[in-house]
Amino acid sequence: MARYDRAITVFSPDGHLFQVEYALEAVRKGNAAVGVRGTDTVVLAVEKKSTPKLQDSRSARKIVSLDNHIALACAGLKADARVLINKARIECQSHRLTLEDPVTVEYITRYIAGLQQKYTQSGGVRPFGLSTLIVGFDPYTRIPALYQTDPSGTFSAWKANATGRNSNSIREFLEKNYKESAGQETVKLAIRALLEVVESGGKNIEVAVMTREEGVLKQLEEEEIDIIVAEIEAEKAAAEAAKKGPAKET
């Protein structure tokens, strides 16, 4: 095995950092996650595995709050996510204590991306095997925001995006169907996008919503998700029926 394949700080002859690419592969194998930014709403939707009957499903949440006005979802290694989330939460608290102001969504995104980048060039560590979607409202302007970070430390702002398993298919769906909307329509779009790759319907979907009016993260209950999924399926059936046109009389 070549030296540049073992060490995270050594480039290969063609300019690759293989450990970073391996971390990106861990992301591609992770459960799908979708983020959508509306005019007054931000939504995170994540594919989740079925939990055993005896497991407390609350302990397997994939969408978490970093601060009152910021939430994060990720695809990749759960243990890596726990470490990164704890560091980000401490930074949010430290910022409040030091400056007496909450962080902006961009600030904490830069912090998380900086941590991820640092772990690509430091000895004795490896890159974080996860990609994050970060949503929230700026505490000063109340403008909604959606950012993505990846294991290399790159971050970017989006209107809608996906990461994890089948993210390319979900992204294509979002590109075709995204319209800047508000409220429930934003939630529906996120769930519709995830249903493109989740075959078992609403029971394997986790959804969290934050609105400008309430300003805090709300995790949707399974019953609420089922209602929205039923609405989406009814709309899809009506659209297909309209395409076929009225039945011909014999």
Swiss-Prot record:
GO cellular component terms, A-Z: cytosol; cytosolic ribosome; nucleus; phragmoplast; plant-type vacuole; proteasome complex; proteasome core complex, alpha-subunit complex; spindle
Source taxon at top rank: Eukaryota
Main subcellular localisation: cytoplasm
InterPro entries associated with the record: Ntn_hydrolases_N, Proteasome_alpha, Proteasome_alpha-type, Proteasome_asu_N, Proteasome_sua/b
Induction comment from the UniProt entry of this chain: During cell proliferation.
Annotated crosslink Glycyl lysine isopeptide (Lys-Gly) (interchain with G-Cter in ubiquitin) location: K62
Keyword DNA repair (UniProt): no
Biological processes annotated in GO: ubiquitin-dependent protein catabolic process
Location of this chain's protein in the cell: Cytoplasm; Nucleus
Signal peptide extent: none
Gene3D superfamilies in UniProt: Glutamine Phosphoribosylpyrophosphate, subunit 1, domain 1
Tissues where the protein occurs: Expressed in roots, leaves and flowers.
UniProt entry keywords in alphabetical sequence: Cytoplasm, Isopeptide bond, Nucleus, Proteasome, Ubl conjugation
Described function: The proteasome is a multicatalytic proteinase complex which is characterized by its ability to cleave peptides with Arg, Phe, Tyr, Leu, and Glu adjacent to the leaving group at neutral or slightly basic pH. The proteasome has an ATP-dependent proteolytic activity. Mediates the association of the SCF(TIR1) E3 ubiquitin ligase complex with the proteasome.
Family recorded in the similarity comment: Belongs to the peptidase T1A family.
Record note on quaternary structure: Component of the 20S core complex of the 26S proteasome. The 26S proteasome is composed of a core protease (CP), known as the 20S proteasome, capped at one or both ends by the 19S regulatory particle (RP/PA700). The 20S proteasome core is composed of 28 subunits that are arranged in four stacked rings, resulting in a barrel-shaped structure. The two end rings are each formed by seven alpha subunits, and the two central rings are each formed by seven beta subunits. The catalytic chamber with the active sites is on the inside of the barrel.
Protein name (database record): Proteasome subunit alpha type-7-A
